């Protein structure tokens, strides 16, 4: 694996400097874009929320997506097992 280098990313108006390898860069950028999008989805509708509250609500929405995908994956595994 290559040596990490610095990557500046912006999430909800804040700049973060991360250390990533060239192999990780595209995935980190995609993750950053998704987190930023989810924070804007929450924060743009609720102007009275502070940054921390927006981050927590976005994290809850992202986790909900993750749990839904886990359930769907398990259902697909069950269907595949039944067809064997």
Where are these regions (language model features)?
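C-terminal structural segments of small proteins and small subunits
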Residues: 60-84
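Generic detector of leucine side chains in alpha-helical contexts
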Residues: 7, 18, 49, 57, ...
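Amphipathic, hydrophobic secondary-structure cores in small proteins
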Residues: 14-61
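N-terminal intrinsically disordered, cationic/polar leader segments
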Residues: 1-2, 6-8, 82-84
């Amino acid at each position: 694996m290559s040596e990490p280098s610095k990557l500046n990313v912006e999430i909800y108006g804040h700049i973060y400097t991360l250390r990533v390898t060239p192999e990780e860069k595209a995935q980190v950028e995609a993750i950053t874009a998704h987190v930023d999008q989810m924070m804007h989805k929450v924060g743009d509708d609720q102007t009275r929320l502070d940054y921390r509250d927006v981050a927590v609500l976005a994290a809850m929405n992202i986790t909900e997506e993750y749990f839904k995908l886990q359930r769907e994956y398990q259902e697909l595994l069950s269907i595949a097992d039944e067809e064997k």
